[in-house]
Amino acid sequence: MTAAVAAPKISSARLIVCYAAILGTLPYLTLKASWVTGGDLGLRDPSFVDSGLMRFANLLTGGMDVVAVVLALAFTYSWGRRIPAPLVLFPIWIGTGLLAPIVLNLPVIVADLTKPELDEMPLENWVWAVVYGGFAWQGVLLLTAFVLYARDRWWFVVTGTVRPGSIGVTGGLGIAAALGAATAHVFWSFSTGGMSARGQDVVVAVLAVLAAIALATVSRGRFWPRLVLVWTGAGAMAGSGAWALFSAFGMSASGLGHVPMLAVQVVGGVLMMTSVLRRLPHAA
């Protein structure tokens, strides 16, 4: 008779990171639950969330935070290592792309929250602080949980050497798209939008350029730092670009002029990530 093998003990640090990340989702999920069920929590103008499109957007973004909760648990408990890699990597890649720019842009966002124009918005002032504070909290803790998980599951990516080959046409097109998107975001950062939106454009531009440089030099030096830069920059291109496309088509007709470049940006992010994944080291 075979004795059952005990699951490895989970460190206190990983449990703290996991449940702190989950705790960071609760204020946002509470707001979304209120709005999709007809509540007016944090709303100056309840009609702001009454349309079918806004209900869909709130369900979508609330669902994304539910996925974040599941990921935090998967990154911590042993069952998470049995999930097929694509089901883990795709959502956390998009999550990285959405959350990392917010974390990096947080000082500008905080400065923007002090503006008196906020008093004219349909949401109470404290809602903005809760939402963006929660995103930054999740960005730090969820990505920390992922790094610890990835270190255990794919340790050979850190210790191994890059697989021979070139970035190919896929990588070349991705780099071209990244540089084009970076140029567009720098141009957009000089628009008349709010400071936080303009700061976000600068952050996405910088991340895209760093990803392009990392992919172009992926065969030189250590692989994993370049993988991190491509992962983050390509994720920012795909994640922020996809969200901007949704906003342009669904919530802000004024952004339709950005649609062609945003589409190039999303495709470019996918191409860059595809290219770098082909160079992953093999497990020994």
Per-region residue spans from a language model:
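Cytosolic juxtamembrane helix at the C-terminal end of the final transmembrane segment
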Residues: 76-81, 144-163, 215-225, 274-284
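Membrane-interfacial, low-structure loops and terminal tails that flank and connect transmembrane helices
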Residues: 1-11, 152-171, 284
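Loop-to-transmembrane helix junctions at the membrane interface
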Residues: 74-95, 215-235
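Membrane interfacial helix motifs at helix-loop boundaries and amphipathic/re-entrant anchors
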Residues: 32-61, 105-133, 185-204, 240-265
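Alpha-helical transmembrane segments of multi-pass integral membrane proteins
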Residues: 20-31, 94-105, 132-141, 166-189, ...
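C-terminal transmembrane-bundle signature of multipass membrane proteins
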Residues: 27-32, 182-192, 201-284
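Hydrophobic cores of alpha-helical transmembrane segments in multi-pass inner/ER membrane proteins
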Residues: 61-71, 133-150, 204-215, 263-278
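Membrane-interface helix-loop-helix junctions at boundaries between adjacent transmembrane segments
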Residues: 79-153
